[in-house]
Amino acid sequence: MKFTRYPKRDAIRDYFPLPNEIFSLGLSTGEIALYAYLMYCEDRKTFQCHPSYKTIGNAVGMSKNTVKKYVDSLIEKQLITAEPTSVYTQKGKKRNGNLLYTVRPIAEALEQYYEQQLIRLHEENRRQ
């Protein structure tokens, strides 16, 4: 029996990309975990996914309220967008569905982060 240290895996199916720049944005561990899970779930062609707060919470070990807090934070930092969806029941009633998350290009988030850093620097210089 031949020993193989690492089993062969399909790079596209078994792995997901996480940009290196994500660690330069000053994100908390919860934000990084949530962002990584959304990257894991996303469709690689549309950059969209639609897990529920409960599904995300179970995957990363957070409560639904904590997931909502971090989703709002990632939206504010322009890393993701979230759009409400709706579903129809068998009886024809319209209900709220899961949010549709779109993972935005990391360059936009970096640009906003650097702009905020410059604004803070200018404010600190004015105070001195």
What are these model-predicted stretches?
Residues 1-66, 72, 94:
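Short recognition helix of helix-turn-helix/winged-helix DNA-binding domains
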Residues 44, 126-128:
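Proteins with a high burden of low-complexity, intrinsically disordered sequence enriched in S/T/G/P/A and R
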Residues 64-126:
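Winged-helix/helix-turn-helix nucleic-acid-interaction surface
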